Amino acid sequence: MDPPARKEKSKVKEPAFRVEKAKQKSAQQELKQRQRAEIYALNRVMTELEQQQFDEFCKQMQPPGE
């Protein structure tokens, strides 16, 4: 195989490689975005639970006469 033929062959693979790399990058970004949304949702739930527990604690700490 002569050098010009190798060059042409590598040029054919290059666009497919770039497309595959772009797909991987896009999938990675989607995964990161989904994980971030899940973390925010979990944080919101945990904050609400913490507030409920704190309110319950405050009620228990109040003297019965108040």
From Swiss-Prot:
Domain of life: Eukaryota
Single biological process term from Gene Ontology: protein secretion
InterPro entries: SVBP
Phenotype reported upon loss of the gene: Mice display a significant reduction in whole brain volume, with a particular decrease in white matter. Neurons show decreased, but not abolished, tubulin detyrosination, leading to an accumulation of tyrosinated tubulin. This causes delayed axonal differentiation and morphologically disturbed dendritic branching. Mice show behavioral abnormalities, including increased activity and reduced social investigation. Mice lacking both Matcap1 and Svbp are viable but show a reduction in brain volume: microcephaly is associated with proliferative defects during neurogenesis and abnormal behavior.
Tissue specificity field: Highly expressed in bone marrow, spleen and testis.
Keywords: Coiled coil, Cytoplasm, Cytoskeleton, Secreted
Biased composition (Basic and acidic residues): 1-23
Region Disordered, residue ranges: 1-30
Cited function: Enhances the tyrosine carboxypeptidase activity of VASH1 and VASH2, thereby promoting the removal of the C-terminal tyrosine residue of alpha-tubulin. Also required to enhance the solubility and secretion of VASH1 and VASH2. Plays a role in axon and excitatory synapse formation.
A single Gene Ontology CC term: extracellular region
Name of the protein described by the UniProt record: Small vasohibin-binding protein
One family name in Pfam for this protein: CCDC23
Family: Belongs to the SVBP family.
Gene that specifies this protein: Svbp
Subunit structure: Interacts with VASH1 and VASH2.
Native source species: Mus musculus
GO molecular function: microtubule binding; peptidase activator activity
Coiled-coil residue spans: 5-52
Location(s) in or outside the cell: Cytoplasm; Secreted; Cytoplasm, Cytoskeleton
PANTHER family from the UniProt entry: SMALL VASOHIBIN-BINDING PROTEIN
Disulfide bonds: none
Lineage: Eukaryota, Metazoa, Chordata, Craniata, Vertebrata
